Amino acid sequence: MDVTIQHPWFKRALGPFYPSRLFDQFFGEGLFEYDLLPFLSSTISPYYRQSLFRTVLDSGISEVRSDRDKFVIFLDVKHFSPEDLTVKVLEDFVEIHGKHNERQDDHGYISREFHRRYRLPSNVDQSALSCSLSADGMLTFSGPKVQSGLDAGHSERAIPVSREEKPSSAPSS
């Protein structure tokens, strides 16, 4: 049986499971040395690996929770103000859109835009949906669930984003 053994110099740390930050949503915030030379860590030592969760924890990934009583979405939108955000409910989906025009930051000028779309459970009471933005930039979208025999009231409507002065109580995974 022939087994091909590849030298660690030619391996990319975790391959497609560890994407480069170079062109992700943090474009313009500066780079880690790993972003410029991803093969360097395995060249120096085949046993050294960057933390898998370093980029995951700082990537703005949303968290969706659906328990027996309510449905909640947490989304890191620290670069956007409430005026830059639009939250709409279209039938069984919530659409979150953020856009700010070009502005100056520490690294030059930047403009950002994103679209997120989530399916709402069929038993979420759409007349009682709320959305708030915490002081640390965490958007919280929530709605109570109704008992399965009741109509949840599906329609199209905009949800206003209110600003909170305290940091979010969302877990920082």
From Swiss-Prot:
It is found in: Cytoplasm; Nucleus. One of its GO terms (cellular component) is cytoplasm. Residues 52-162 form the sHSP domain. Residues 1-63 are annotated as: Required for complex formation with BFSP1 and BFSP2. Acetylation at Lys-70 may increase chaperone activity. The modification Phosphoserine is found at S45, S122. Zn(2+) 1 binds at H100, E102. One of its GO terms (biological process) is response to heat. InterPro entries: A-crystallin/Hsp20_dom, Alpha-crystallin/HSP_16, Alpha-crystallin/sHSP_animal, Alpha-crystallin_N, HSP20-like_chaperone. Residues 145-173 are annotated as: Disordered. The modification N-acetylmethionine is found at M1. The modification Deamidated glutamine is found at Q6, Q50, Q147. One of its GO terms (molecular function) is metal ion binding. Residues 153-167 have a biased composition (Basic and acidic residues). Keywords: Acetylation, Chaperone, Cytoplasm, Eye lens protein, Glycoprotein, Metal-binding, Methylation, Nucleus, Phosphoprotein, Zinc. Heteromer composed of three CRYAA and one CRYAB subunits. Inter-subunit bridging via zinc ions enhances stability, which is crucial as there is no protein turn over in the lens. Can also form homodimers and homotetramers (dimers of dimers) which serve as the building blocks of homooligomers. Within homooligomers, the zinc-binding motif is created from residues of 3 different molecules. His-100 and Glu-102 from one molecule are ligands of the zinc ion, and His-107 and His-154 residues from additional molecules complete the site with tetrahedral coordination geometry. Belongs to the small heat shock protein (HSP20) family. Contributes to the transparency and refractive index of the lens. Acts as a chaperone, preventing aggregation of various proteins under a wide range of stress conditions. Required for the correct formation of lens intermediate filaments as part of a complex composed of BFSP1, BFSP2 and CRYAA. This is Alpha-crystallin A chain.
